[in-house]
Amino acid sequence: MAMIELEFGRQNFHPLKKKSPLLLKLIAVVFAVLLFCEFLIYYLAIFQCNWPEVKTTASDGEQATREPVLKAMFLADTHLLGEVLGHWPDKLRREWQMERAFQTALWLLQPEVVFILGDIFDEGKWSTPEAWVNDVERFQKMFRHPSHVQLKVVAGNHDIGFHYEMNTYKVERFEKVFSSERLFSWKGINFVMVNSVALNGDGCGICSETEAELIEVSHRLNCSREQARGSSRCGPGPLLPMSAPVLLQHYPLYRRSDANCSGEDAAPPEERDIPFKENYDVLSREASQKLLRWFQPRLVLSGHTHSACEVHHGGRVPELSVPSFSWRNRNNPSFIMGSITPTDYTLSKCYLPREDVVLIIYCGMVGFLVVLTLTHFGLLASPFLAGLNLLRKRKTR
């Protein structure tokens, strides 16, 4: 009886023994692909990005001084999904992509300041107080950063609503989390952060208040320039750095369309000639002229279109539209790296992993697992064994 039981146990052991190596192989393949697609691919992509070189010596009469360089990252249109239109697979996939990309960029590139150019959230324009708190907590987890790294945010139309949806409650709710500062100065560099949604120009309360704040910032910047030239019209007070500011906003300055935009992350060719609507796709011509006149910026960075574009306003003021940071809006998201001094700057673009490449790798993994399983159970000849059999047949001829 004992011999029969032992023999029965041996017979059952062989199938288990046969299945165990297959299971281990399948687990190993899945683990390796997950590790690469969800972690290592971000290091592989961002490791290829380097801070652009910028001239760091400024001539002051006969003396040359070395200027400090600020390393700044610019990204836009993260569009964290909300409870109404968002569904959990989309949230999980796209938010994990942005979190891994951002955390990898922080670790590899070590920026000093990060600017996000609006549309942080997808449903801030209508989210309930409870949903808003949940969205903010997710944002703070995804875009967590060391205390020595500054994170600055400007409002977009999806954060506080388009002009006709915007109200004081939504603006104050946003500014309570992300600050209401309009001017940020560091290392002798001035950044003006504009609530471009409130530049409709129709005299609404929020619009008037926003314009008054921007005029005050413009006055302070101009006073610093004049006092540096020996003028005393502005009276006593702390001086701002006298360098021309960098303008940061969500809406681009006025342009007719993306017809003159080019590059792999520009708008698709069939969309480039579509005319833009003022105060919807871009700022109005009037608001754009005001900003250029008030601040005389040396550089403008904006978001909103989800695509890249470089234009020059008046033939001298460059504006760069920053593509979306999320796979939800682009197959090839990216961000801008800037090496900036008080008198000069250089920008470069860092591309994140392409979503279609990741999907192709996963599809390839599924196909490989199917072939491996069929081969293991003898339902499909192993390519290696098939090759050996072919060689044997040739030798016997």
From Swiss-Prot:
Q: Where is a divalent metal cation 2 bound in this sequence?
A: 77, 119, 250, 306
Q: Which InterPro entries match?
A: Calcineurin-like_PHP_ApaH, Metallo-depent_PP-like, MPP_MPPE1, PGAP5/Cdc1/Ted1
Biological process terms from the Gene Ontology for this record are: endoplasmic reticulum to Golgi vesicle-mediated transport; GPI anchor biosynthetic process
Q: Which domain of life is it from?
A: Eukaryota
Q: How are cofactors bound according to the entry's free-text note?
A: Binds 2 manganese ions per subunit.
GO CC annotation: what is one?
Golgi apparatus
Kindly state the positions of the motif Di-lysine motif in this protein. 393-397
Q: Which cofactor does it need?
A: Mn(2+)
Q: Which membrane topology describes this protein?
A: Multi-pass membrane protein
UniProt subcellular location? Endoplasmic reticulum-Golgi intermediate compartment membrane
The entry's function note states: Metallophosphoesterase that catalyzes the removal of a side-chain ethanolamine-phosphate (EtNP) from the second mannose of the GPI-anchor protein intermediate. Participates in the glycan remodeling steps of GPI-anchor maturation to allow an efficient transport of GPI-anchor proteins from the endoplasmic reticulum to the Golgi.
Domains: what does the record tell us? The di-lysine motif (KxKxx) acts as an endoplasmic reticulum retrieval signal.
Family, according to the entry, reads as follows:
Belongs to the metallophosphoesterase superfamily. MPPE1 family.
What name does UniProt use for this protein?
Metallophosphoesterase 1
